């Protein structure tokens, strides 16, 4: 799967909006993930106790983790598909330490699209959404290949 230069530009244009408030976007995305797929919360020992959206919004740890997640993703997206060096340690930790199934990466991808659309409706139209979906699908495909190399059937 390859994105055109124009598609990558759409991805990076919306990502510039994310970078104005990485932690806030990350927190919103994690809240959307946990509300939509409560089973994903079980993978996070330090967040398991957060049961309500209000508790999640009040959690500085959740906000920090959202910042970490989106900072890593931003670094990958900026490589425009040439993300081997960034992907390898991420796949290693998510396969061997955290044991995060690929399905959960699909769930967070959906949460990313939803939050970007809700926060930036004028800047995240159908073309930008399609480009971001394609970029996230490329990321998932490549991380799934790394999982396979590591013997993780996530």
UniProtKB/Swiss-Prot annotation:
<feature type="binding site" description="proximal binding residue">
    <location>
        <position position="94"/>
    </location>
    <ligand>
        <name>heme b</name>
    </ligand>
</feature>
<dbReference type="InterPro" id="IPR009050">
    <property type="entry name" value="Globin-like_sf"/>
</dbReference>
<keyword id="KW-0561">Oxygen transport</keyword>
<dbReference type="GO" id="GO:0098809">
    <property type="term" value="F:nitrite reductase activity"/>
</dbReference>
<keyword id="KW-0349">Heme</keyword>
<keyword id="KW-0514">Muscle protein</keyword>
<feature type="modified residue" description="Phosphoserine">
    <location>
        <position position="4"/>
    </location>
</feature>
<feature type="binding site">
    <location>
        <position position="65"/>
    </location>
    <ligand>
        <name>nitrite</name>
    </ligand>
</feature>
<dbReference type="GO" id="GO:0019825">
    <property type="term" value="F:oxygen binding"/>
</dbReference>
<feature type="domain" description="Globin">
    <location>
        <begin position="2"/>
        <end position="148"/>
    </location>
</feature>
<dbReference type="GO" id="GO:0046872">
    <property type="term" value="F:metal ion binding"/>
</dbReference>
<comment type="subunit">
    <text>Monomeric.</text>
</comment>
<keyword id="KW-0963">Cytoplasm</keyword>
<keyword id="KW-0560">Oxidoreductase</keyword>
<protein>
    <recommendedName>
        <fullName>Myoglobin</fullName>
        <ecNumber>1.7.-.-</ecNumber>
        <ecNumber>1.11.1.-</ecNumber>
    </recommendedName>
</protein>
<feature type="binding site">
    <location>
        <position position="65"/>
    </location>
    <ligand>
        <name>O2</name>
    </ligand>
</feature>
<feature type="modified residue" description="Phosphothreonine">
    <location>
        <position position="68"/>
    </location>
</feature>
<dbReference type="GO" id="GO:0019430">
    <property type="term" value="P:removal of superoxide radicals"/>
</dbReference>
<dbReference type="GO" id="GO:0016528">
    <property type="term" value="C:sarcoplasm"/>
</dbReference>
<dbReference type="InterPro" id="IPR002335">
    <property type="entry name" value="Myoglobin"/>
</dbReference>
<comment type="similarity">
    <text>Belongs to the globin family.</text>
</comment>
<dbReference type="GO" id="GO:0004601">
    <property type="term" value="F:peroxidase activity"/>
</dbReference>
<dbReference type="GO" id="GO:0005344">
    <property type="term" value="F:oxygen carrier activity"/>
</dbReference>
<keyword id="KW-0408">Iron</keyword>
<dbReference type="InterPro" id="IPR000971">
    <property type="entry name" value="Globin"/>
</dbReference>
<keyword id="KW-0813">Transport</keyword>
<dbReference type="Pfam" id="PF00042">
    <property type="entry name" value="Globin"/>
</dbReference>
<dbReference type="GO" id="GO:0070062">
    <property type="term" value="C:extracellular exosome"/>
</dbReference>
<dbReference type="GO" id="GO:0020037">
    <property type="term" value="F:heme binding"/>
</dbReference>
<comment type="function">
    <text>Monomeric heme protein which primary function is to store oxygen and facilitate its diffusion within muscle tissues. Reversibly binds oxygen through a pentacoordinated heme iron and enables its timely and efficient release as needed during periods of heightened demand. Depending on the oxidative conditions of tissues and cells, and in addition to its ability to bind oxygen, it also has a nitrite reductase activity whereby it regulates the production of bioactive nitric oxide.</text>
</comment>
<keyword id="KW-0479">Metal-binding</keyword>
<keyword id="KW-0597">Phosphoprotein</keyword>
């Amino acid at each position: 799967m390859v994105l055109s230069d124009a598609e990558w530009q759409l991805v990076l244009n919306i990502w510039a909006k994310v970078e104005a408030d990485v932690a806030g976007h990350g927190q919103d995305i994690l809240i959307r993930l946990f509300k939509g797929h409560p089973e994903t919360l079980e993978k996070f020992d330090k967040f398991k106790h957060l049961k309500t959206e209000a508790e999640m919004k009040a959690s500085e740890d959740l906000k920090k983790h959202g910042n970490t997640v989106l900072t890593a993703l931003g670094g990958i997206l900026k490589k425009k598909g040439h993300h081997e060096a960034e992907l390898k340690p991420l796949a290693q930790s998510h396969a061997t330490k955290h044991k995060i199934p690929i399905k959960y990466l699909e769930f967070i991808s959906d949460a990313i699209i939803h939050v970007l659309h809700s926060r930036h409706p004028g800047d995240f139209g159908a073309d930008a959404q399609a480009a971001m979906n394609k970029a996230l699908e490329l990321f998932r495909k490549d991380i799934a290949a790394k999982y396979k190399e590591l013997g993780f059937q996530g």
